[in-house]
Amino acid sequence: MANLNKVMLIGNLTRDPELRYTPKGTAVAELGLAVNRVRNNDQGERIEETTFIDVTLWARQAELAQQYLGKGRPVYIEGRLQMDTWDDKNTGQKRSKLKVVGENMQLSLIHI
């Protein structure tokens, strides 16, 4: 059976992109994205839920994000899910976090 790992998100940046470079000179940008979902509860009241997602962009996409995006700006991200794991320096415990590795980014002209 074939596998598929694809994510498509439209949301607003929660902070300015943080750009850095690897020792080999590859650009990496870290973004925070807030994605809103509106639904009705059992009483018919409208409820807005926000999901906060960390996104990593690489190479030219990272540089473009740093150049054109800022906190509050709407953006479309296509990418894949990736599990990051590390050892907590304070407790020594293993930690993990699901994030999105962006493979395509489009600036949105409308504010979400």
PLM region descriptions:
Residues 3, 9-49, 94-96:
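Core FKBP-type peptidyl-prolyl cis-trans isomerase
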Residues 6-8, 52, 72:
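Intrinsic-disorder/low-complexity, polar/charged segments enriched in Ser/Thr/Lys/Arg/Asp/Glu/Gln
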Residues 58-94:
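Beta-rich strand-turn-strand
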Residues 43-67:
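A beta-strand/beta-hairpin structural motif
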Residues 20, 106-108:
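Nucleotide phosphate-binding site architecture
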Residues 110-112:
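Conserved small/polar residues in nucleotide/adenosyl-binding loops
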Residues 3-6, 30-32, 54, 85, ...:
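Residue-level recognition of specific faces of alpha-helices
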Residues 11-13, 33, 71-83, 102-105:
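OB-fold and OB-like beta-barrel modules that bind single-stranded nucleic acids
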